[in-house]
Design a protein with these regions (language model features):
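Beta1-alpha1 glycine-rich phosphate/pyrophosphate-binding loop at the start
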Residues: 5-59, 149, 158-183, 253
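FAD-binding core/adjacent interface of flavoenzyme oxidoreductases
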Residues: 1-7, 75-148, 230, 256-264
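Residue-level detector of alpha-helix initiation sites
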Residues: 13-14, 118, 157-158, 280-281
Length: 313
């Protein structure tokens, strides 16, 4: 059994739900397929989103799902295993969550809003604390951990920039060079770190010290322990764009990873195939991802409208 839609949105995060909201309000028959693995699930709260500052991510998504339902958008919890482009897009699902148990849905336009995955450095204890007292973004978490003892785990020379940035939220900052050699720091780096009062510690980090479910320190491979309450890291952002590449979308290398080539609206090099949110480029914050989804949704409605008008001429 197959189902036909005007638009299928793959991914039910901020970008996907925003695109679906616009399309639903434009009276487009839209399906959202969500696998239920949001990037910010480890975080207790999301920050910096006007009117939603401090809201738990799960609550934010629940509100978004309720909003799109008001406009007739269908949402199913399933996983896309494949998609093929012919006269339209045929999207095959893993669990058969479509009405009637169908596993294949068709659409004229396809939006991929599958986001990205944070790949943490291989240090014992990081994953368990990530989103709590191991964090990556001062704009997302800085206020909540302000004035505590910060550590910054260096994995590239760009970690110097991160260490300097977080001094806005605490004056007690230690940069653990970890896998970055002292010789990789420039004279300008060293002068800026000194001016900011950042303590620089050479040596590789072995693991974290945790007491009573709170980070209390960072342990180096030589057994030295430095008391720290918060550790900033720079995960490798891995875009979840396999579906786009399988459908033939061209990609480009960026400082933040390999992303699809898109125009200002999110349209890829494949007609009818769109990318939104962190699948379209490094959006980072939830509000930016939502904005890209909104923009793609509005553009898709226009594409469909004028395609129908041209066909009627």
């Amino acid at each position: 059994m197959t189902e036909k839609y005007e638009v299928i949105v793959v991914g039910g995060g901020a970008a996907g739900l925003s695109a679906a909201l616009v399309l639903g309000r434009a009276r487009r028959r839209t399906l959202v397929v969500d696998a239920g693995r949001p990037r910010n699930a480890p975080a207790a709260h999301m920050q910096g989103y006007l009117s939603r500052d401090g809201m738990p991510p799960a609550e934010f998504l629940a509100a978004g799902r309720a909003e799109i339902a008001r406009y007739g958008v269908e949402l199913i919890h399933d996983r896309v295993v494949d998609a093929v482009r012919g006269e339209d897009f045929a999207v095959r699902l893993a669990e058969g969550a479509l009405p009637g148990g169908g596993r294949t849905a068709h659409a004229r336009q396809l939006v991929v809003a599958t986001g990205l995955k944070d790949e943490l450095p291989p240090v014992a204890g990081l994953a368990e604390r990530f989103g709590r007292d191991v964090v990556h973004c001062p704009y997302c978490h800085g206020w909540e951990v302000r004035d505590q003892a910060f550590g910054v785990l260096a994995t590239t020379p760009m970690s110097v920039h991160q260490a300097l940035m977080v001094t806005q939220w605490s004056k007690d900052v230690t940069l653990f060079l970890h896998t970055v050699g002292e010789e990789e720091l420039t004279d300008e780096d060293l002068r800026r770190l000194a001016a900011a009062g950042v303590h620089v510690v050479p040596g590789e980090v072995a693991d974290l010290v945790v007491e009573d479910d709170r980070l209390t320190g960072v342990r180096l491979t030589d057994s030295r322990v430095y008391d720290r309450e918060v550790l900033f890291v720079a995960p490798r952002a891995v875009p979840q764009t396999d579906l786009l590449t399988r459908l033939g979308a061209e990609t480009t290398e960026t400082p933040f990873g390999t992303y699809p080539v898109v125009d200002g609206r999110g349209l890829t090099t494949v007609p009818g195939l769109w990318a939104a949110g962190n699948a379209s480029g490094f959006a980072e914050q939830v509000v930016n991802a939502a904005s890209r989804g909104y923009r793609a949704g509005a553009a898709i409605n226009g594409e469909l409208l004028f395609a129908d008008l041209d066909a009627a001429l």
